[in-house]
């Protein structure tokens, strides 16, 4: 009877899940230390033929004499966030927002991003207390489909309204972007990235469609940033300079923060060593909207 009870307890325990995080060495951001690092590296090379996966041969890498965990994990970013524009905080309202695709994603920060398209937008919507309400009334939001304008006397070219607010606990915003994808007359898929609003009242270059450098820098020794660069909010109205009303296309918004230290750099600083040389030392956290599709018919 005692053995039976013990067996049942083991079965129940095995069905439960636990969650833990790896150490900096296991994440691959700092090297293994001492003889354990050398043993791990050469043992992995010696027995790599036992692993059928190509990734098995790269589980550990040697850089400047130091042994790091390899594989794809060190190149990954940290966890992101899913954001929903729902009318209220209820299961039904949130589900409806998912159904109409009025959702966006971030790489981790709590950035707020709005994206609309329509034919009757004007500059007053950027500052009016009813601006977002008017955008819903006269256009479509992220995740929606914009049809060709058939109203006589109005422009065939849609206007896009984009607003973003920074996470107050993170870096300021650097730029707003719109990414356009389309299929040309020959059936080829195309894509182009437009900078549409720049921090610190800088102007987008009309030829390159890029914001100038706003001077944001990161001190790799301490991960300190210069908070006087960047903006807490960015907002603009934008029209596609190459818009073709006959082409099917999609547009989505993206907002980038000023550069900050990547998680692997933070690990290295806390360990009192230099960051791993083959990984990016900084990252620009960001948010992406769901796309708005244009149907030219």
Tell me what each language-model feature is.
Residues 1-14:
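Single conserved hydrophobic/aromatic residue that forms the stacking wall/gate
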Residues 12, 19, 40, 44, ...:
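C-terminal functional module detector
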Residues 13-43:
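Divalent metal-dependent hydrolysis catalytic cores, especially in the metallo-beta-lactamase
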């Amino acid at each position: 009877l005692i053995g039976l009870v013990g067996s049942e307890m083991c079965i129940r325990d095995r069905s439960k899940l636990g969650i833990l995080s790896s150490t900096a060495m296991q994440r691959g951001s700092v090297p293994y230390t001492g003889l354990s690092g050398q043993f791990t590296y050469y043992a992995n090379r010696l027995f790599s033929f036992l692993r059928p996966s190509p990734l098995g041969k790269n589980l550990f890498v040697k850089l400047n004499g130091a042994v790091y965990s390899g594989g794809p994990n060190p190149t990954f970013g940290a966890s992101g966030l899913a954001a929903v524009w729902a009318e209220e905080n209820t299961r039904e309202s949130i589900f409806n927002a998912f159904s109409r695709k009025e959702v966006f994603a971030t790489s981790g920060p709590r950035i707020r991003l709005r994206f609309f398209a329509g034919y009757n937008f004007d500059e007053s919507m950027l500052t009016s207390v009813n601006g977002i309400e008017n955008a819903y009334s006269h256009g479509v939001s992220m995740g929606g489909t914009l049809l060709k304008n058939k109203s006589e006397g109005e422009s065939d070219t849609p206007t896009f309204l984009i607003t973003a607010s920074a996470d107050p606990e993170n870096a300021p915003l650097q730029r707003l972007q719109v990414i356009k994808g389309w299929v040309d007359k020959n059936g080829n898929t195309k894509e182009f990235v437009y900078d549409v609003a720049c921090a610190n009242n800088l102007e987008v270059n009309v030829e390159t469609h890029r914001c100038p450098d706003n001077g944001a820098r990161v001190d790799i020794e301490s991960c300190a940033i210069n908070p006087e660069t960047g903006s807490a909010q960015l907002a603009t109205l934008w029209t596609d300079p190459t818009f073709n009303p006959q082409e099917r296309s999609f547009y989505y918004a993206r907002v980038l923060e000023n550069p900050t230290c990547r998680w692997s750099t933070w690990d290295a600083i806390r360990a009192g060593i230099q960051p791993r040389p083959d990984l990016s030392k900084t990252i620009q956290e960001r948010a992406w909207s769901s796309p708005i599709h244009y149907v030219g018919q």
